[in-house]
Amino acid sequence: MFPLLGLFGGTFDPIHKGHLALANELIQKLPSLTEIQFIPSRQPPHRPSPLASPADRLEMIKRAIANQPNLILNDVEIKGNDISYTINTLKILRPLFLTHALCFILSTDAFADFKHWHQSSVILEYCHLIVVNRPNYRLPQQPWLSDLLSHHQTENAEDLGRFQFGKIFFQTLSPRPISATQIRHYLAKGDYEIVAPLLPKTVLTYIKAHKLYQQ
């Protein structure tokens, strides 16, 4: 059996309690998943540029995951100078973790667009996909999606450890309707009291000190 290494990509603009709760619940529900690496993207392929700088987003993640040894910061995409394509990240990480099964974590709505990812046809040659539910979202019925799942989906979490790559596993987690977009909206207006329950205290302190997301 291969130990599982979770890869959690995103802009984390900013990182919030929903991200942390997702990672910790995944570790609880998948015993073989002992570590999740947060991989902030420099420039995501299908989204506008993050509002906070790479340096600020790295620092916020560092503060958010401090004293949580199962959660690790990986700056591989921040170090890049180009668009942060998942396949390029996997090609860098695969040789570094030859004894692990890499598990890329994504939401159902992101998975619904998987066909349009750069070199999506080879991504599963490097990793598994762990697809987590998004509140109030259902996967569309599309032929390409049905075909992909018929070849790769497993309902047995142990398959993620039996194989190093190639499996798609759906994991249901507690719903957490926390939106970074909404958080940025309130931060732009200086409504710190509204976002305080949604952000780690150390992250909110950093945002205030550096006047991030202000209009």
Curated annotation (Swiss-Prot):
Spell out the Pfam families in the cross-references.
Answer: CTP_transf_like
Q: Which PANTHER family match?
A: NICOTINATE-NUCLEOTIDE ADENYLYLTRANSFERASE-RELATED, PHOSPHOPANTETHEINE ADENYLYLTRANSFERASE
Family in the record: Belongs to the NadD family.
Task: Please provide, alphabetically and separated by semicolons, the GO molecular function terms listed in this UniProt record.
Answer: ATP binding; nicotinamide-nucleotide adenylyltransferase activity; nicotinate-nucleotide adenylyltransferase activity
Q: Indicate what this protein is called per its UniProt record.
A: Probable nicotinate-nucleotide adenylyltransferase
Which CDD domains does the UniProt entry name for this protein? NMNAT
| Known function | Catalyzes the reversible adenylation of nicotinate mononucleotide (NaMN) to nicotinic acid adenine dinucleotide (NaAD).
E.C. number: 2.7.7.18
Q: Give each disulfide bond as a residue pair.
A: none
**Record gene name:** nadD
Reactions the enzyme catalyzes: nicotinate beta-D-ribonucleotide + ATP + H(+) = deamido-NAD(+) + diphosphate
One BP term from GO: NAD biosynthetic process
SUPFAM superfamilies in alphabetical order: Nucleotidylyl transferase
Supply the alphabetized keyword list: ATP-binding, NAD, Nucleotide-binding, Nucleotidyltransferase, Pyridine nucleotide biosynthesis, Transferase
According to UniProt, this protein's pathway is: Cofactor biosynthesis; NAD(+) biosynthesis; deamido-NAD(+) from nicotinate D-ribonucleotide: step 1/1
